[in-house]
């Protein structure tokens, strides 16, 4: 039985019965954990307003089985104020984490990166793309995705900024004359290593890489948050 307070965020919530919710949390000490929030759908439930995304929470739960029961949830601080594009970006991060994190496996460093990511999305909405790419690379590292961006996987030679490299899943980057969707310039790979996305071309290459790298983790089912983001983006650009 667990009775201590734990820091966490809501990743996803879904109906469990007429009155309750199943809630996926990302917690500092236990990683992703699904808890039964009894009565959380009732109009007067104190949990109803608390169990919202982007709100730093203090949580307590109990139970011995796989599905434990949430016994207490309190805001640790104010909900992070997300503007439109930042809001959908936050939903994207939450949806990806809900899919890729192992159940009840601690990712303490990634939890800190998540907190930094959410804070930056709320305070630097003009930097959404670099913020997302940075977190995706940090997430891949936490998942054990061991790609070396500074060494050619075939020869062991240092990556040359002027050469082109082909990405091979489960191997790494190999020097190649081929030019296709899996090709990357050495200068971009070296920037990936430093999480430096200040160059626009590097930023675009980083997005291309993370989509390929995350695909095995995410599976074939489309991300709902990505579809929502793509649907609101044209209207946002027109009004902006």
From Swiss-Prot:
Keyword field contains Repeat: no
GO cellular component, one term: bacterial nucleoid
Name the UniProt record assigns to this protein: DNA repair protein RecO
Species for this entry: Actinobacillus pleuropneumoniae serotype 7 (strain AP76)
Biological process annotations from GO: DNA recombination; double-strand break repair
Gene: recO
Segments passing through the bilayer: none
Pfam families: RecO_C, RecO_N
Taxonomic placement: Bacteria, Pseudomonadati, Pseudomonadota, Gammaproteobacteria, Pasteurellales
Family: Belongs to the RecO family.
Free-text function comment from the UniProt entry: Involved in DNA repair and RecF pathway recombination.
InterPro entries, per database record: ARFGAP/RecO, DNA_rep/recomb_RecO_N, NA-bd_OB-fold, RecO, RecO_C
HAMAP family: RecO (MF_00201)
Gene3D superfamilies associated with the record: Nucleic acid-binding proteins, Recombination protein O, C-terminal domain
Tagged with keyword DNA repair: yes
Alphabetical keyword list: DNA damage, DNA recombination, DNA repair
SUPFAM superfamilies for this protein: ArfGap/RecO-like zinc finger, Nucleic acid-binding proteins
